[in-house]
Swiss-Prot record:
<feature type="lipid moiety-binding region" description="S-palmitoyl cysteine; by host">
    <location>
        <position position="186"/>
    </location>
</feature>
<keyword id="KW-0564">Palmitate</keyword>
<feature type="lipid moiety-binding region" description="S-palmitoyl cysteine; by host">
    <location>
        <position position="185"/>
    </location>
</feature>
<keyword id="KW-1188">Viral release from host cell</keyword>
<keyword id="KW-1043">Host membrane</keyword>
<dbReference type="InterPro" id="IPR050874">
    <property type="entry name" value="Diverse_PLD-related"/>
</dbReference>
<dbReference type="Pfam" id="PF13918">
    <property type="entry name" value="PLDc_3"/>
</dbReference>
<keyword id="KW-0426">Late protein</keyword>
<keyword id="KW-1038">Host endoplasmic reticulum</keyword>
<feature type="short sequence motif" description="YPPL">
    <location>
        <begin position="153"/>
        <end position="156"/>
    </location>
</feature>
<keyword id="KW-0261">Viral envelope protein</keyword>
<dbReference type="GO" id="GO:0016020">
    <property type="term" value="C:membrane"/>
</dbReference>
<dbReference type="GO" id="GO:0019031">
    <property type="term" value="C:viral envelope"/>
</dbReference>
<keyword id="KW-1040">Host Golgi apparatus</keyword>
<keyword id="KW-1187">Viral budding via the host ESCRT complexes</keyword>
<feature type="domain" description="PLD phosphodiesterase">
    <location>
        <begin position="307"/>
        <end position="334"/>
    </location>
</feature>
<keyword id="KW-0378">Hydrolase</keyword>
Amino acid sequence: MWPFASVPAGAKCRLVETLPENMDFRSDHLTTFECFNEIITLAKKYIYIASFCCNPLSTTRGALIFDKLKEASEKGIKIIVLLDERGKRNLGELQSHCPDINFITVNIDKKNNVGLLLGCFWVSDDERCYVGNASFTGGSIHTIKTLGVYSDYPPLATDLRRRFDTFKAFDSAKNSWLNLCSAACCLPVSTAYHIKNPIGGVFFTDSPEHLLGYSRDLDTDVVIDKLKSAKTSIDIEHLAIVPTTRVDGNSYYWPDIYNSIIEAAINRGVKIRLLVGNWDKNDVYSMATARSLDALCVQNDLSVKVFTIQNNTKLLIVDDEYVHITSANFDGTHYQNHGFVSFNSIDKQLVSEAKKIFERDWVSSHSKSLKI
């Protein structure tokens, strides 16, 4: 019935946030806890979750969500949680707590063993989905600032479920040749919507390149294209910008996103605001990169601030016309090696709502000048 139905603006997407209780502002949007709770409550057939790691029991709200999942699984709802092979530290405890949930560890890069599953998304019944930067941890549900998108528009949920199928094909328990065969089966039907064919002004982008499949857009290509075509403004709220790729303990320069930001500021006079995170998970190059941008563009309209509370929000807004929400840092290692799905939209309402979030964060008491 989808081809004959009118497509709602923004594909029925709503922004979703986690805000720590010690912040000086609240959100009018759906909380991550409310979003995950609704997905579980409305599920009738299945719930699929992809996350680097799984540690919901670390906070009270995370534990409540996991208990709801346990209840759903006991009622016969099929629940699969994909974890990266290197993010399975708490797996034994969770399996003993709820044996009816199927936990699958994946390795998306058995050949080189450098790629990780970074994607943070939920899909249920091909009807509802969440994608953003909230992993399936108690912190992301309760104590760490995150941003994502929830939709109950079935075509969009189905399109995201195809990504789940792709990542699931890299089950680390399978032989490598089985991984390749399984992936080959799901890649040809890997997406229905992309930058040239958005649905309601919405589409997903993907990484890394070897998992793209037919007609998917490489996330780095879309991000860099948007940065290079920016005319008036670029607003970035990210945990880190790191112009390097790490392989086997060695660092290699990867300036693609970094250069695109500098070119926009210096060559085209674009107004740029960069709000970076500052906590112990940051790459050593992150603050150095922020300072170098601030210094190099001192004669241009580029401002840098640091968010002082744990902030895993990863948001890009260009010309107040395009919004990008992802689970990856603007980091060469993430973009060259890791597996994730990003949300993109040119829908005016969604862009406007995301812009309000950025403005709120930018002027809050938690945002400090880099020069202080």
